[in-house]
């Protein structure tokens, strides 16, 4: 799968939730490996902030990115839409300290993205595949986010509002392609008990019933409720009647929890990579979301080079017989048993190392270790299959080494190991010459790596 960006630019205008300012945000296409960057075009020098978890400086009433004295808030809805629709690279330009709140959901962003279209780029999409359970908890609030291994990204949010009229809810998104219809229209919400402190803090100047669901879930005095109704410019209501205060009906009964899921995706966008895993978020909020995103970035840095996923129960893309049709190598020099994944620019091969390998007779009889040069040879054979797979009549061509660079051996390979070869093209095949980067894994660990240049030559 390839990285994606927008086919063109688009602009949205509206007021800021907290500042009440009239704001404009423009979404622009960006080059490969650019990621999400946000630019304050109203400030001298037009500073740019990378949209990553470490740059979050506040999570009290939304996600606020910062760099020095520069701040950009309420970014989560825009990033949620980009991330869910598979956009990897985008430059967002805003003319103020926050994004416009629009209708309190992500639906306007989704509509505009779909309107301008999505463009596939050449670079491969760099997924991070979850291999083990990762969990972040806040004992005080009871918030918890857990991510488990899964083949695709899916999310479940569970919220407990501890109210007589709204208690526990959950929302699930098993298929990210359903985001536009099932999650994007869910609006932000606020409790009546929180409105007065927010107003006293000089916030929510742009908040109204057109961009938020207001929940009156705990009874207060009639006098206080009337005062808040006047602030919101809505009709007075009986203080004994709990419920929603809104202009528009709920889109779904669990709209508030769906919006929490929308926010989780927006804060996940700050991880910087698309994720394959199942997220379960209990009582999520921007603070725990950001802690989770930071933890994920630490985990990714620890496994900068990630081993391919291998399920021995799945049938291979190419078995040993098909490999023999492509490669001239035979016993004892055929060093790839099967291919489990192949695409235009990458390939994954497998070799099972047994005690019967002929090279163990001399390397070394008392302590059998696979020679490093044979690991490189096996990597190159895998890369050769990748290159040959891109030409017509591959059986009529052979691959030859031209150069090997950056060879590193990190760990011994011994009988019983299963080797995974991951090889990626560094540049397209030109004039029969290709550059590739290869890794050999045992389990999750890299045991060797190399960069090599090879040439395909037609057989005589």
Regions found by a protein language model. Name each.
Residues 1-88, 93-310:
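C-terminal regulatory domains involved in ligand/effector binding and gene-expression control
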Residues 5-9, 317-323, 420-421:
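Short Pro/Gly-enriched beta-strand edge/turn motifs at strand-loop
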Residues 335-338, 403, 408, 422-424, ...:
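Residues located in well-ordered beta-strands
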Residues 258-271, 339, 369-394:
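Active-site helix/loop of acyl-thioester processing domains in fatty-acid/polyketide metabolism
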Residues 89, 278, 337-341, 406, ...:
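Extracellular/lumenal ectodomain signal focusing on beta-strand-rich modules
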Residues 272-281, 308-317, 383-420, 447, ...:
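Hydrophobic beta-strand-centered segment that forms part of the acyl-chain substrate-binding groove
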Residues 171-189, 370, 440-448, 452-460:
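Flexible glycine-rich active-site/ligand-binding loops centered on an Asp-His dyad
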Residues 302-369, 396-398, 413-414, 426-428, ...:
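Non-catalytic linker/capping segments at the edges of enzyme domains
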């Amino acid at each position: 799968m390839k990285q994606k960006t927008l086919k063109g630019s688009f602009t949205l205008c509206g007021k800021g939730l907290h500042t009440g300012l009239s704001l404009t945000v423009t979404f622009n296409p960006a080059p490969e490996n650019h990621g999400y960057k946000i630019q304050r075009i109203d400030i001298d020098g037009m500073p740019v902030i990378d949209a990553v978890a470490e740059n979050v400086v506040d999570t009290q009433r939304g996600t606020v990115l910062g760099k020095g004295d520069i701040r950009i808030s309420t970014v989560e809805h825009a990033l949620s839409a980009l991330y869910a629709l598979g956009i990897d690279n985008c430059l967002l330009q805003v003319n103020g300290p926050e994004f416009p709140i629009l209708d309190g959901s992500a639906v306007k962003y989704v509509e505009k993205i779909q309107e301008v279209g999505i463009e596939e780029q050449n670079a491969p999409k760099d997924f991070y595949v979850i291999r083990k359970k990762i969990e972040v908890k806040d004992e005080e609030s009871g918030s918890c986010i857990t991510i488990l291994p899964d083949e695709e990204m899916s999310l479940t949010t569970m919220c407990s509002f501890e109210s007589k009229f709204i208690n526990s809810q959950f929302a699930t998104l098993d298929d990210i392609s359903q985001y536009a219809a099932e999650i994007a229209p869910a609006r932000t919400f606020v409790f009546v008990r929180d409105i007065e402190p927010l107003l006293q803090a000089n916030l929510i100047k742009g908040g109204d019933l057109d961009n938020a669901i207001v929940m009156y879930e705990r009874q207060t005095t009639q006098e206080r409720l009337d005062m808040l109704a006047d602030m919101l410019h809505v009709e007075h209501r009986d203080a004994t009647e709990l419920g929603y205060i809104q202009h528009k009906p709920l889109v779904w009964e669990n709209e508030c929890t769906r919006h929490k899921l929308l926010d989780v995706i927006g804060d996940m966008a700050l991880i910087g990579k698309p994720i394959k895993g199942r997220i379960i978020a209990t009582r999520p909020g921007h603070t725990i979301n950001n802690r989770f995103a930071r933890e994920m970035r630490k985990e990714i840095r620890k496994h900068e080079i990630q081993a391919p996923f291998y399920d021995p129960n799945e049938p291979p893309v190419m078995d040993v017989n098909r490999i023999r049709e492509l490669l001239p190598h035979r016993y004892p020099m055929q060093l790839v048993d099967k291919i489990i994944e192949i695409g235009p620019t990458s390939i994954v091969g497998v070799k099972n190392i047994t005690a019967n390998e002929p090279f163990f007779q001399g390397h070394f009889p008392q302590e059998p270790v696979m020679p490093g040069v044979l690991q490189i040879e096996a990597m190159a054979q895998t890369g050769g299959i990748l290159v040959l797979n891109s030409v017509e009549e591959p059986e009529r061509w052979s691959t030859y080494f031209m150069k090997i660079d950056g060879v590193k051996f990190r760990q011994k390979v011994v009988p019983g190991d299963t080797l995974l070869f991951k090889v990626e093209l560094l540049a397209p095949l030109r004039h029969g010459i290709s550059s590739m980067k290869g890794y050999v894994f045992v389990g999750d660990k890299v045991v060797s790596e190399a960069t090599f240049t090879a040439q395909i030559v037609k057989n005589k």
